[in-house]
Structure formats: C-alpha cells, structure tokens
Amino acid sequence: MAEVRPVLAAASLARPKGERAAARREHWQKVAIAACEQCGRNRIPQVHALVPVEQYVLKENSSQKILLSPRAELRFSEACRTLGESLTLAAGPEAGFSAAEEAALLDCGFVPASLGPRVLRTETAALAALAALNALRGDF
C-alpha cells in the first residue's frame, strides 16, 4: 500500500474540519509510520487529507480500480486476476456509498467487487481486501 486517501461520503460518521481534520491526518500518518517500523517495511504510505467523494473522483487517474461492494456479483479474487503493479481500492463508510457516490465511482472506472457473502465493517473490509490481495500476489 502506497497511499491512503480518506474520502468524505454522505454516510460518513466522522466529519472533522479545519484543525481537527489536520490533526486526524497527522495521527493516521503517525500510525502508518509506527506500523511500518513494527513490521520492517521501508516504504511508508502517505496519508492524504480528507476530501469529498465528488472531489476525489475528479483527480483519480489510476488505471485499475476496485470498489468494494457487498452487492457486487464479481468476486474480489476474480477482479484481481488481471492486476498489474498498482491498484486503487475504494471501501465505503459503514452504511455504504450513496447511489450518486457509487455512480460517480463507477463512472470514474471503478469495478465493483465483493469480498463474499458477509457484510464487513468498513475498516475490516479494507484490511481483508489488502490481506487477500497480498495472498493473491504470493506475499504470504
């Protein structure tokens, strides 16, 4: 993982602004640094500032994108079969992205994929997807 780009969605519970948003970003950057130190990783992911989904899709230009969606027919493992070196992964808030936000992500080129029959918490879904991706790429 090279970057973390938090997005503000309609269903997002946390809505920090101003100094509070900057403090949260700094906190998560420190968490990323500590995690890298613990596991011996020499490249620290950059944690970006919080932006609305609508603003995020205007700047997203990755060639391969997966949107985690419990309603998707395509399984995550199938979506990852043709991956190159980089991938952008989108995990929504606890209640999911709104229909408009999901449409914007799909229009931006995200492919919806499911992690299976269980609906996972947002933080669990993102970690499960990253772990599955590492396993599929032979990192385990």
Q: Can you name each region flagged by the protein language model?
A:
Residues 16, 76-79, 122-126:
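Short, charged, surface-exposed secondary-structure boundary motifs
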Residues 60-102, 110-113:
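Active-site/ligand-binding-proximal alpha/beta "capping" segment
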Residues 3, 37, 94, 101-102, ...:
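Acidic-residue sensor for enzyme active/binding pockets
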Residues 1-66:
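RNA substrate-binding interface of SAM-dependent RNA methyltransferases
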Residues 99-140:
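Structured adenosyl-cofactor binding patch, chiefly the S-adenosyl-L-methionine
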Residues 19-21, 80-83, 103-105, 128:
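Short, glycine/charged-enriched secondary-structure capping and boundary segments
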